Each structure stands twice: as C-alpha cells, then as structure tokens.
C-alpha cells in the first residue's frame, strides 16, 4: 500500500491547471451506452475512478480508443450481457459508486440493466431509492436480490411521466434523465439536480438528438426520441480541484494562480472562500491568490459565529466542506461547519485535533473550528485517508504542519486527484510517494 511522506512548511508558488471534472466524467462516460454511434470525450482526468470506469465499459463490450492523453472515443454497438453476470463485473462495480449510472442508459437502450450494490467513499449512507423510484415511474420493474446484493431493472418500453424527486440527487437525476431520453412521450422531473455537470450531460445529450428543456433549473422536461447519434464533448475543469488549490494557497500562505477554472461554473464557491477572509482576483478565466500572512473569517451582522453549510446546487457542494474545515484551522476567528448531507464526512477531524487544531465535533454533522491565525503551527503526525476529499484536506494540513507527516491509504486520494504529489512538488511542495509500503 502506498503512502505519502509530507515535509511541511514549504510555500507554493506558480500556476496550476485543474484536471477535467471527475463527477462529470462518470456521468458522460455512462451516457456513451445510449448510442451505437461513436462519442469522443476530451479533458478526461486520468484518475483511478475514471480509469476503472473506462476499463469496465471496455469489458462490457464498448469499443474504447485513446486518441490523446486526455481524449477517448467510445462506440457501444453492442453490450455483452453475459459479462454482466460475472464475478469480474461484480468486483469492478462494487469498487466504484459511479457505476450505478450505467443502469439508466442500459435500461433506456436495451430494456434491462444489472448492477451490484456499488462502492465508493465511506462517508455515510447514500440512498439509491431516488434512482429506482424514477425508473419505476417510467414503467420499469425493479428487483433487488438480497443474497447477492444485485439490482436488476427491466422495462422494454419506458413511458414518459411526471415525477417529483424526494431529493435533488445528482446521480439520481442523471440516471433518470438518461433513461427518459429514449422513453415514449414526455417526462417532467421536478426537484431535479441542476449543478453544472448535470447541465453538461443534458447539453451533450441534446447534441446527440435528445430533446431536453429546462437545463440549469430544477424542472426538466424531456421529450423522448427514438435514437441518439454521435457527438464530441469536452469536460469542465474540476471545481473541487479549484477549491482545493485555493485552500492550499491560503493555508500555506502561498501565491498561486489556478488556470482555466471556468469561473462562471464555480457558483458560490469563490464567495464562500471570501467569507473565510481569503483574497483572490479573477483574471480572465484564472484565479490569482496572493500570498496572505493572515485571513479573517467573517461574522454575521449580529456578530454571531459564521456558518458554512452544504446545500444542493446552487448551494455549496458538500465535497468542499472538508477543505473549508482544514483551512479554518489557521484562520483568525471561528466558524461552524455544517455537513447536512452525509453523517460520516467530518470524522477525520480527530487527526486534525491530534495535529493541534482547535475543533469541537458537535455531532456527526457539525464541527466548530477556532482558528490559530498562523500563531501556532500544526504538528506533523501519522494519519490515514478515509476518503478522497478528507484525504486532500489532511494533505493540506500536512503541507502546513511542522515536521514530516505520513498519510496512509493514498489510493483514496488517487481516486480523485491526478498525480497530486507531482503537480504540487512542481510548485514547491515536498511530498514523497512510497509504494508497496507495509
């Protein structure tokens, strides 16, 4: 198992470009199953989760060709349904939560979809009810084999309908949209997720011949079509990487430029960093973060402690809360971090407390952080990455700490960040990757 050795106290300097968006990539790659025509996708991040999905598609029978370092073409003329019953298919799907989005395209085009209970980050319960209730409303029959933990959905002729989702699930909305584009008649989805990556999926499907309206709102209307054609698509930059790099610059008192961020698709993220007292400038489509010795957290108008909470888009994406939390440990002032959507994503704060951070874990959803204002440096320690984003938060803490920290289970970080050690070392960080470490 690989580990990181991180020597803290080295400031960053220079510029860095975010990779293509992982969460968009998972949706877009699954959507290639909707057509027998060739779909070319650019700006694909070469990270573990995405590469695993590409290999899974290849084993399912999709013709996959790498055209450039970050460009692949996909042609799903046929699917090997015998493979979907194999242990290899089960094993690969259970490692990747995004594999659940294979069901919608398979159901729409082939009338049946199989998937084992998917895996992914251990960050609490994440229900799949929204996906399957949506399929049932379109006329599909759902079955879950409890013994094998295997989902099967069948529906030879899906029919459009109205549905009000019980939660604005991003993957649930994507799955239902992909099923509905080939259904008969009109489908209306209310309380749909509307984040930029879902918008990108809908725009790509429209270029392929789908008829989706209401894009960027929480009310989508889909007029079913008989078939979809070929297209090319370019992924947006990953907003989570953008936020991570802003946090790194502030925490390490560094001057940094984040290039080609697609600022218009960052939503409330820049404003939330501004509430943390972090200064930055928008320069065309780049974000410049000047070196700051101190940053002060705002308070509410009545003087009460600032709260930063996640919410469905256009609210703050929950995957950045761990970054805000670790950045707050060296801010001036205090902040309440409220993680509403997952109940286990804040448990990594124990390691930050071991490093000397002042954090009160109020309950599984809330933590109060009292910043050191860079008067006291965090202490190096040994820690384990529990999931992708908490792993990067711990990496940020280690980069600013005094001494050499060890981070285990860095495969979790590799799932979401391409060559993160090499890219940060090029900016001045001191991160050593040690492979096959027991």
Predicted feature descriptions by range:
Residues 1-438:
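Short, structured segments at the rim of ligand-binding sites
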